[in-house]
Amino acid sequence: MAKQIQAIRGMNDILPTQSPLWQKVEAVLRSSVSAYGYSEIRTPIVESTDLFKRSIGEVTDIVEKEMYTFEDRNSDSLTLRPEGTASTVRAGNEHGLLYNQEQRLWYMGPMFRHERPQKGRYRQFHQFGVEVYGIGTADIDAEVLMLSARLWQQLGIDEHVSLELNTLGDPSERAAYRDALIAFLEQHKDKLDEDSQRRMYSNPLRVLDTKDSQVQALLADAPALMDYLGEESKTHFSTLCELLDAVGIQYRVNPRLVRGLDYYNRTVFEWVTTSLGSQGTVLAGGRYDGLVGQLGGKDTPAVGFAMGLERIVLLLETLGLNQDIAPEVDVYVTAMGDSCLVEAFKVAQELRQALPGLKVMSHCGGGNVKKQMKRADKSGAAYAIIIGENELANNQVAIKPLRNNNQQELVARDALAETISALI
């Protein structure tokens, strides 16, 4: 017997029993961005490696450790996309979408990072993101946060997530703060863990995001970024907070929030939850006004966020919110004998045409009454439609409830669609 081939570690199948919850989440995401007037963009999953080195930053965990990179037959270095923003900017620059234009975009699709697989985090994961280009004011920052808050409300998890905010200032302000932070870290170099020592000069702001408890305690005395901000950056952040207050979105200012990607400036934010054990991020984003220019376009203000669908699905399952999912099948049509098969197929097709939203499954493969009823029950359908020789002779069909103890009833053939419509 040949050896069975299995999925690559960290790359999971989404099985038929799981897909209805995924479809529900995806439908909520699509309807929410549509309500705000955003347009979908779809980009390739394979890009030039240089795109991510220039956007994410070479001294980041993603580029150094996590990217799936390979050479193609032309010896070009290619990478499976680890996130969606860089690809969206590349597409915008390439097709002239961003030149003196405002764009409100969204995307959804698979991304790839060679991380240690764990529950809710996989090497192939599905990401949903929102990107806005051409608007540099705080009101658009507030809008994308309002949109994200709407997602939680629509999914029924708004009581289980909370918003954290910070501002990183502009590049010159951050450079001044960077120097002050390096000077502070140099004084305490012997107390830093290996990762923090490595990042101290190459990417010192990432030290603020350390998980090492000893370094976290040390950072309590570190310089505060807020003290290095100019009036324009302070006004931008205070306006954002004022707008969020006005629409009732609660938040906490977290001065240690810096995000893991190099391209952010000014506003950064995360939605976090404690419902998955230790505090975990379920959505993150911010402003990246320099990225479009960094990737060869004209300097363009931009803001956006991304979220991993696996984490959202896991959160819904953990909270028990995966129970009330519409069944894949509403009615299951059976034929009791070969002589009834043609009529059963006609009935199923007529139902689909008369009731386009109805999910109709026809029994195939023959079998006795017991086998067909077992299949009907397993399908999850609410009703079985039974066509036997007696029903055929009397121009009737039988409707059998599968999810309650109500009695089976006979209805006229031409009244079936109306009857089913009233029942479902």
Curated annotation (Swiss-Prot):
InterPro entries cross-referenced by the UniProt entry: aa-tRNA-synth_II, aa-tRNA-synth_II/BPL/LPL, Anticodon-bd, Anticodon-bd_dom_sf, His-tRNA-ligase, HisRS-like_core, HisRS/HisZ, HisRS_anticodon
Database matches in CDD domains: HisRS-like_core, HisRS_anticodon
A GO cellular component entry from the record: cytoplasm
Major localization listed first in the record, in broad terms: cytoplasm
EC number(s) per entry: 6.1.1.21
Reaction(s) catalysed (UniProt annotation): tRNA(His) + L-histidine + ATP = L-histidyl-tRNA(His) + AMP + diphosphate + H(+)
Domain of life: Bacteria
Coiled-coil segments on the chain, per record: none
Keyword field: Aminoacyl-tRNA synthetase, ATP-binding, Cytoplasm, Ligase, Nucleotide-binding, Protein biosynthesis
UniProt cross-references to Pfam families, sorted A to Z: HGTP_anticodon, tRNA-synt_His
Subcellular location: Cytoplasm
GO molecular function: ATP binding; histidine-tRNA ligase activity
Subunit structure and binding partners: Homodimer.
Family affiliation: Belongs to the class-II aminoacyl-tRNA synthetase family.
NCBIfam families: hisS
Protein name from the UniProt record: Histidine--tRNA ligase
Organism: Shewanella denitrificans (strain OS217 / ATCC BAA-1090 / DSM 15013)
Gene field: hisS
